[in-house]
From Swiss-Prot:
This is Small ribosomal subunit protein bS16. The lineage of its organism: Bacteria, Bacillati, Bacillota, Bacilli, Bacillales. The gene is rpsP. Belongs to the bacterial ribosomal protein bS16 family. It holds the Pfam family Ribosomal_S16. GO terms for biological process: translation.
Amino acid sequence: MAVKIRLKRMGSKKAPFYRVVVADSRFPRDGRFIEEIGTYNPIAQPAQVNIKEDKALEWMKKGAKPSDTVRSLFSNAGLMEKLHNEKNGK
């Protein structure tokens, strides 16, 4: 089972709102997921990002791969650096 951390689109037409979810890569984008670990609202100025850091780190340590967009959100939040430091024992 290839697990991905990706965005699930919510909201209405022309007003997107996303949930950051952990899902099997074979499931549809807005379909079934394993766990919700955050939200992303690109419409708000500045964009609102809420991520459960402990859950995100836990899933990435288990091998879940973030999508490109989620990876960028995690980098801006400092999560990728935390993961790198934990893996290298700093």
